[in-house]
UniProtKB/Swiss-Prot annotation:
Principal cellular location given in the protein's record: nucleus
Segments forming a coiled coil: none
GO cellular component, one term: chromatin
Annotated protein name in UniProt: Biofilm regulator 1
Length: 422
């Protein structure tokens, strides 16, 4: 552009050699006043004559949109003009059109309903757009209402964006129309759920912002199909601590009788298994119960707690060999008051008891039920006999039988004479 202006200035000044050659300044070249005819000098008019054929004052079309139009500089009749407020120049001075609006027109025929932007300097009248008619709320189901409701926008949206939102809502309504038709066809079929149909009939006349269709669900029993060849496992019933295995016959269903027992079904009582635990026995005293088992001459856990302590004491005193011999040979048993007595002493006591019982047995005298006393018995005068000392506090069973009556005096004299002769 600067080269064209310099050429034009050189051609104008070529006729007069005496005149000075003046080149346009950068501000003159860049300012819009020179293009629109605001300056009156010759250079400005030359620049205007060169640039005006390309950009006219009546309609200036953007070069990028000229390709869409079929080579025509004016827009088609179907497109609406896009008006912009006047722009003030930076150098000082306004456009040649004055306070009128500029005639920049978008040549794109596809954009027909663009929103108009409001200007703070000039009031622009916004033409009311016709809103699409919506079907009545009673004919729509709750599901279609949820689909048809546009996205809620905050109330702080400016007036300039309101036509755009209406346009979007209109497009959204047009796109959702086939979905409404499908849902209305589905509602016409008898397979529709009763809850959705009932809610659609009871809806109020005014549309609600968001309504969701609810459906009630009820628990139903679940049946598992088992293969026909495999019978179900027989149930097991516990009765009085025993496990009862029920044997079912093929082709019959299980029945429940009184107290949970199946009637007329053969069953066998399975008794619990008894585990025989190995019981330890002390090698010295023979007991089976002890707080702790100890090591003995024949290995671990062979002596009870008391016998094990006694064996350990003998090992320290006499050695292992003598301790083992005394522990194994001199066995003990439980005596009186829970005390332990060696087997040798116990056998001696038992033999003495048996001898005393044999010696204490008497023979009847003179046809009376009297007992014959041992030889140590000596009768005294007066007819009362004294008993020999008894061991271990033992007394005869029949004490009254020990009283011997004195024989008649004739028999006493005969016995004394017989003793003197001998």
């Amino acid at each position: 552009m600067s080269s064209s202006s310099s050429l034009s200035s050189s051609t104008t000044t070529a006729t007069t050699t005496s005149a000075r050659i003046r080149l346009p300044s950068i501000s003159e070249l860049t300012s819009r006043s020179t293009i629109s005819g605001g300056s009156n000098n010759g250079n400005g008019s030359a620049l205007k004559s060169q640039i005006s054929p390309r950009l006219s004052d009546t309609s200036r079309i953007l070069p990028s949109i000229l390709k869409n139009t079929s080579g025509s500089s004016t827009p088609t009749s179907s497109s609406t003009p896009f008006k912009c407020p006047p722009i003030k120049s930076t150098v000082g001075g306004t456009l040649s059109s004055g306070n009128t609006q500029s005639n920049y027109v978008l040549g794109n025929t596809k954009i027909n309903s663009l929103p108009r932007l409001s200007s703070p300097t000039l009031p622009v009248k916004v033409q009311p757009q016709q809103q699409p008619q919506l079907p009545p709320a009673s004919s729509l189901s709750p599901v279609t209402r949820v689909i048809n409701t546009p996205p809620q926008q905050p109330q702080s949206v400016s007036a300039s964006t309101s036509p755009n939102t209406q346009y979007q809502y209109y497009q959204y309504q047009q796109q959702s129309s086939p979905i409404q038709q499908q849902q209305q066809q589905q509602q016409a079929t008898p397979a529709a759920t009763p809850t959705v149909m009932q809610m659609a009939q009871n809806q109020p006349s005014h549309p609600a912002p968001l309504q969701y269709a609810t459906q009630q669900y009820y628990p139903q029993p679940v049946y598992y199909q088992s293969p026909a060849g495999v019978p179900p496992p027989p149930p097991s019933v516990t009765h009085q601590g025993h496990i009862i295995a029920v044997h079912q016959h093929p082709g019959h269903l299980p029945q429940v009788g009184v107290n949970g027992m199946p009637p007329n079904v053969g069953y066998t009582i399975v008794q619990p298994e008894i585990v025989n635990k190995s019981t330890n026995r002390c090698h010295r005293c023979g007991t089976t119960e002890t707080p702790e088992w100890r090591r003995g001459p024949k290995g671990v856990r062979t002596l009870c707690n008391a016998c094990g302590l006694f064996h350990a004491k003998l090992v320290k005193r006499k050695g292992a060999a003598l301790a083992a011999e005394e522990v194994l040979n001199n066995k003990v048993t439980k005596g009186k008051n829970g005390r332990r007595i060696s087997m040798k002493k116990h056998l001696l006591n038992e033999s003495l008891k048996q001898q005393q019982q044999i010696n204490g047995v008497g023979i009847p005298i003179n046809g009376f039920n009297h007992q014959i006393l041992p030889p140590s018995f000596k009768p005294q005068q007066g007819g009362i006999a004294t008993l020999p000392p008894l061991m271990h506090g033992q007394y005869p069973n029949n004490v009254n039988n020990l009283v011997i009556h004195q024989p008649p005096p004739q028999q006493q004299q005969q016995q004394q004479q017989h003793n003197n002769i001998c």
